[in-house]
Amino acid sequence: MLIKLLTKVFGSRNDRTLRRMRKAVSLINAMEPEMEKLSDDELKAKTNEFRARIEKGESVESLIPEAFAVVREASKRVFGMRHFDVQLLGGMVLNDRCIAEMRTGEGKTLTATLPAYLNALSGKGVHVVTVNDYLAQRDAENNRPLFEFLGMSVGINLPGMPAPAKREAYAADITYGTNNEYGFDYLRDNMAFSPEERVQRKLHYALVDEVDSILIDEARTPLIISGPAEDSSEMYKKVNKIIPHLIRQEKEDSDTFQGEGHFSVDEKARQVNLTERGLVLIEELLVQEGIMDEGESLYSPGNIMLMHHVTAALRAHALFTRDVDYIVKDGEVIIVDEHTGRTMQGRRWSDGLHQAVEAKEGVEIQNENQTLASITFQNYFRLYEKLAGMTGTADTEAFEFSSIYKLDTVVVPTNRPMIRKDLPDLVYMTEAEKIQAIIEDIKERTANGQPVLVGTISIEKSEVVSRELTKAGIKHNVLNAKFHANEAGIVAQAGYPAAVTIATNMAGRGTDIMLGGSWQAEVAALEAPTEEQIAQIKADWQVRHDAVLAAGGLHIIGTERHESRRIDNQLRGRSGRQGDPGSSRFYLSMEDALMRIFASDRVSGMMRKLGMKPGEAIEHPWVTKAIANAQRKVESRNFDIRKQLLEYDDVANDQRRAIYTQRNELLDVSDVSDTINSIREDVFKATIDAYIPPQSLEEMWDIPGLQERLKNDFDLELPIAEWLDKEPELHEETLRERILAQSIEVYQRKEEVVGAEMMRHFEKGVMLQTLDSLWKEHLAAMDYLRQGIHLRGYAQKDPKQEYKRESFAMFAAMLESLKYEVISTLSKVQVRMPEEVEAMEMQRREEAERLAQMQQLSHQDDDAAVAADLAAQTGERKIGRNDPCPCGSGKKYKQCHGRLS
């Protein structure tokens, strides 16, 4: 009560922020007559004037009123569009390192031109981030005339572009691209072998469109660049044959139900667990297939990879559904993004899941991959000096933006008041009744000439609705991941009178639905339209537009609630743009995933007690509240997962930053001989210490062992025993100095053969290659550690603290291993002529190029619950004899800590 009273008196934080910014808007409006008087050339010259002022020490913030006034005037001249005052407010919010919540149709694309221009004046570059390639290209091409009029260059960063084209795009003042491509370019730059191969500049200002989709929906999925591992496709096929013999246990959590099933599914946590009965059957079937020996256990250390295959196959069959989670196209399994409904070409699930799905669908199984580099969006976007974003729906996630990204959310008012009617939810007992009610609603509304957009949560559901509409004889368009090439065209005409459009979550985000359809699309379809044709098209459109307004505007039907209220709001936001009329309603059934998993059985029990007949719906505030609570539960669970992922990834992030900084320093220098000399001393000291303990008696020295080690690891044959026999006065310190001096002498002789320049080149190549190889193995070891670390909780230890402690020890061991491997490689390599060194360098580059071609870019399904699932199935995951040792030494497990066990 007191808070409400204080808010009434002083206004909310949002109100106070907008009040402060409105003063600047008044200044910009006051400058408008002055800007209108300037000629085109004088207006263009303002850009160079602003740049000169920044170089003299003026801050970018002090230029806001003038710069925004210049962009507004340029927009009037180039596009014939004037920024509204609310768009100026939005631009200031975006410059203020905040999230601007602007409703659909309020002109976010035009708003973005203001902060993009302002922050590009410093010459450090601006990255505008969009959710897909189509929007990146569209926005870049749409805004290019404005920016080029003001003397700014525009670049587009698309997947598959050659490195020179990417460098050119990043060198532009303003670069448009997708979140994935920016992230992958960052990882690729940190795998480059020369400074010339890098494409990105220092990360300065990122302006993220649909910021909720990128920083929240996709935050759980790290970007991973991986290379091929060994082929195990046959094993996936064999295990896949066994899974159909297993029966799902329906109600494992019931006290009275005696389960007959072989595995249980936890839909909430997306986990699959074998029951005791299932384990016995699986072991019998594996023995029958000749995969496992009789009497062996699936949980024995030797079968841990087999358990991995069984778990992956079980998850593929029980949790992943065709046309919901993925589609099969041209013999390839393509992931469907659960949040946008778009296909993710080239992306693959990790942990063998993608191969298991390929086996299930009977398509060619591609090799498993090994992680070469990875980063989460959370950590990538926090690398920018300045970050801001805009979306139509951010307020529900304001706490997460603030706690993880330190970004405040500011709700920007609409230009015209919103008059859309959001009708209460209707809840039916069954899916069939719900679909029938939707069809009736569509019939009724289209009869009045009202356009309808039907939002579904998966391709499968969109096709179910489509089939029913076809049966009812209702003409309609379908927009889902299978047909997304037509996306913009379908969305542009979804506002036609009586048009019916079915869309998955992709729902053409970024494309406005114009009431009466898009006259611009009709004009664009003509080859060389005359003025008369354009005038006629506009006149026809006006008639249609008025008819749709009279019918009540665009009606939105949601076929079920999404896990997140924000995505429901996005669907609703397709209607009622720019003060247009519109309406929306969600239809639910007790068979919907959200209701089944989160709304308790009491709701359906209550509905039966109320004596509901087939086809009847319940419309009650209590039910709406229960649904909102269910959504809140899912949102908070997903937030916890993202937060937990970030806390674990922060540990890896510190290490990643250290490695990438060291690697970039290496790339930027041509001579690393000082570093080599320094680490040679460390390596030889540590090696000699193992055989001649410091300040020890001569009887404790292992001279034969030391001689053998120096010969095997450093190609250094030294008669140490002979020296000690002939020179009794030779003590420990002088012996150490002599061994090091001999190693330096041998190395210098090699250098004399090939020349100093070639040797420096070779040293740098060896250091980079060794660093990359060990970092790759370290990432795999960190994955192993991460998957089993939650089990430490049973020993009353904090898994996060244990993970920090052990990963730090592994990192320190990796750095020691790096020194050793570099000196060992440089000492053992036999070089004769400069041509041979050049040939070796060529071979290394060819290998790097081959690997680059085989790299997979993937979104890992790194839900904390999924990681825990695999670890819980396998116990603390055992390491194969030929796997890299988790200690980070770079050696195989059997040659390192495997000896101890």
Swiss-Prot record:
Cysteines joined through disulfide linkages: none
UniProt-annotated binding residues for ATP: Q87, G105, E106, G107, K108, T109, D512
Keywords, in A-Z order: ATP-binding, Cell inner membrane, Cell membrane, Cytoplasm, Membrane, Metal-binding, Nucleotide-binding, Protein transport, Translocase, Translocation, Transport, Zinc
Cofactor (UniProt): Zn(2+)
CDD domains cross-referenced by the UniProt entry: DEXDc_SecA, SF2_C_secA
Membrane topology: Peripheral membrane protein
The family this protein is said to belong to: Belongs to the SecA family.
Protein name stated in the entry: Protein translocase subunit SecA
